[in-house]
Structure formats: C-alpha cells, structure tokens
Amino acid sequence: ERQLPAHFLRIELMVALIGGSLPAVLFLANAYTPGAFRFLLYGMVLVVGTLVGLEIPLVMRILKRNVALKDLVSQVLTFDYLGALAVSLAFPLLLVPHLGLIRTGVFFGLLNVAVAAWAVLLFRAELRAWRAHALACAAVFGVLLLAMLGADRLTTWAEDRFYGDRVVLRESSPYQRVVVTAGPAGVRLFLNGNLQFHSRDEYRYHEALVHPAMAAHGAPKQVLVLGGG
C-alpha cells in the first residue's frame, strides 16, 4: 500500500515519455519504415492506453485515505471526463494549429512530467528513494525538452525522406499542413500528406472543369474564377 505513490510516479513518467514522443516517432517511422508504421502506431497507442487505464485505480486507492468511498469514484471520474473534454477541444482547435503535431505531443508529455514532479513533492515522505524519482522526472523532462527544441528539424527530416523530391515549401496553416515539392517528374502539392496537384497531369483535372463551361457559352470575354487555387 505504501508503494502506490511510487507506482503512480513510474506510470506517469512512462506515459510522459512514450506519449510525448509518440508523434515524433510516428513521423520518422512513416518516412523511414512505412511498412512497420501501422504496427508501431497500434502498439504505442495500446501501451499508452493501458498505462493511462492503470492510473485511475491507483489514484482511487491513494485518495481513499482522505476521501469517503461514496464520493471518491464520482469525483475521480468527473475530473477524468472534464479533463478529456478539455483536451479533445484544445487539441484540434488550439494546440495543433499553433504548436504542430510533434510539439503538441511533447507538450502533453511535459504536463505528465509536471504531475509526476508534483507527486514527488506531495508523497516525498512515503517514497523510499524520492531523490531517484526526482532525478527520473528531470531526465524525462530533459528528453522531452530536446524533442520540443528539435521538432522542426525532425519534421524536416521526416518530410524530406517521405516525399522523395526536394521540398520547396512547407507551411502549417490553422487547417492543414501544406507541402510543395519539385523534382524531375514535376511539381507536386500535398495537403496533410495527401497528393492534391501534380504539374504533369493537372491539365486533365482543369480541362474537365473549364471546357464544358466554355463550350456552353461560346466565346466568353470575361471569366470569373471561384476557388481556382
């Protein structure tokens, strides 16, 4: 029973390290080992989900010392649901558009490290080796901080490898990741990694849109183009 805080700390740090590095690892895996991407994705999600699932029973067992059992379950699950709601809204609307996928993952990892550090201070008297736990928090924090600082470089490496051709433009808008490549085969436009335009065969797409309208009108002198990007 006295080791419950230590178990909670270990799980929290594993969630921070694995969950925080998950987007970066998947970015690199998709670029360098695409055949193993699905297995790595499902495996890491399964591990993180299992660890997060273990946290709630541990928190309940720790809090039952000070909270009545009739109120404990409702309070823990309420905060769990509220936290999940806040994250599900902040992730697509605020964090990813401003931080990007890699930095967003690292940000949540840093939040887990902060929770672990707070737990070290809170349960310091019950931990057999609180200094070792504090050192582990510092080590995980350092790894995630390096990932945060190197996020742009990791993204560049992964995209250069994934697209093959030279990347001439890469931008993240509030809605999508825009990448333009140029190579011997022509210019390509990708939105969120999906091919949208290729200079080699774009005429097929545009001719199908333009010719029927032009033929129906005859000989237009003024043309209004809507959404012609």
What are these regions (language model features)?
Residues 1-229:
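Alpha-helical transmembrane segments of multi-pass membrane proteins
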